Amino acid sequence: MSEAVLSVNHLSIGYGSRCVISDASFTIGKGELVGIIGCNGAGKSTLLKTIRGMLPKQSGEVLFFGKPMEEYTDRDLAREVAYLQQQVEVGFGYTGQDIVMAGRYPYLKWWERESENDKRLALDCMEYTGTRELADKPVTEVSGGQKQRILLAKVLAQQTPVLFLDEPTTGLDMVYQEEIFRFARELAL
């Protein structure tokens, strides 16, 4: 196996005292494309959120590039792992490009505005996901599948070595479902 990007050791997760996944251990190497399958409610999204640090773990260890997740700041972790959540609500007033630009925030200081380079990168990611023509369109006016592809462009604009895609094909027709998996295969290389 190549260099370990993610190591999960004896991880138990759940809500309160209710354990959803117990004693999970696995390692993912650089360039690997991994899918998590299971029944509805089995804990797949909970696992991703816990590994990403969005939910507390009950026990165990999560390492990114050999470093414990707890040693990362939120900003530093956002430079390592981009996460496309299963359900994302987008408020009024945001355009497609606004959403994609949010992927650049881990690289900006609080006083900085996005650079021309950031804007170019965002548009390139929108081009890659077939959403470039939606850059100036309010996200409230696009279809569910178009919104999903805009959100994929956002995680790509984050330029992280690790992507968590939680049900990335939700709301997409068959053609775009195949495209998402093609993107994932290309990105894993």
Stretch-by-stretch model annotation:
Residues 113, 138-142, 146:
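Conserved ABC ATPase signature
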Residues 37-39:
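The feature captures the beta-strand-to-loop junction immediately N-terminal to the Walker
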